[in-house]
From Swiss-Prot:
One of its GO terms (biological process) is lipopolysaccharide transport. This is O-antigen export system permease protein RfbA. May form an ATP-driven O-antigen export apparatus, in association with RfbB. It comes from the Bacteria. Its main location: membrane. The gene is rfbA. It is a multi-pass membrane protein. It comes from Klebsiella pneumoniae.
């Protein structure tokens, strides 16, 4: 395989499709519901949170079901990608040892697979919009790809860092699980950002995940694109990707011996 072929965009795209397809088949092998789990899982969590926060705690947020799922569904994409990335290189150890290819495609394929699951949840959002007397906006046509690309960049940056470092520090899994749980509650998914006291507003200001969630929510519920939030998402994502690829390129030569 020539160097030119290795880094040809067409080759990389085909490789990404093949690995993503393989991961999908492995995940849903012998599964009765198959891809429906990609919708059922976040929808179940949404029902639980709706019961707790709307019916028990009586949070006063209009159209709370739509509010909840427009934050929870994109969060699920990020959280699942970040968590699964920890073992993406380990799960593909045999391919890494026996085949020469750009290994950074492996965590990227995981991000894309979870992104496909997220796309499967958009019809659910549409249904609930109609239930609450709301309608999708024409701005979705360009807004969804714009924010989705930003989330891919951001999530890939996080994933390449986690997947690389986890080969050398296996305790990282526990820290990541705790970190994701902490960030879930520090991100305005279950509550509105204006419910946070002024002295804690920095939690939103310096949290790029908040920008990501609020970007999706503004688009889905209001049909608007908040370019400030989207810019933060892209800026942070590019920084994380650059840092992640730097770590990956420095350590990738030791992958075979570690695996």
């Amino acid at each position: 395989m020539s160097i030119k072929m290795k880094y040809n965009l067409g080759y990389l795209f085909d490789l990404l499709v093949v690995i993503t397809n393989k991961d999908l088949k492995v995940r849903y092998k012998s599964s009765m519901l198959g891809y429906l789990w990609s919708v059922a899982n976040p929808l179940l969590f949404a029902m639980i949170y709706y019961f707790i926060f709307k019916l028990v705690m009586r949070v006063q947020i209009p159209n709370y079901t739509v509010f909840l799922i427009t934050g929870l569904f994109p969060w699920q994409w990020f959280a699942s990608s970040a968590t699964n990335s920890l073992f993406s290189f380990i799960a593909n150890a045999q391919i890494i040892k026996k085949t020469v290819f750009p290994r950074s495609v492996i965590p990227l394929s995981n991000v894309m697979m979870e992104g496909l699951h997220f796309l499967c949840t958009i019809p659910v959002i549409v249904v609930f919009l109609f239930v609450y007397g709301m309608t999708p906006s024409l701005s979705w046509v360009w807004g969804i790809p714009l924010i989705a690309i930003g989330q891919v960049i951001f999530t890939f940056g996080v994933s390449i860092i986690f997947s690389t470092l986890n080969l050398f520090f296996r305790d990282l899994e526990r820290f990541v699980s705790l970190g994701i749980m902490l960030m879930f509650y520090c991100t305005p998914i279950l509550y509105a950002s204006d419910m946070i006291p002024e002295k804690f507003s920095w939690i939103i200001t310096y949290n790029p995940l908040a920008s990501m969630i609020l970007s999706w929510r503004d688009l889905f519920m209001n049909g608007t694109l908040n370019y400030e939030y989207i810019s933060i998402l892209y800026f942070t994502g590019i920084i994380l990707t650059v840092v992640g690829l730097s770590i990956f390129n420095k350590l990738k030569y030791r992958f075979a011996e570690i695996l």
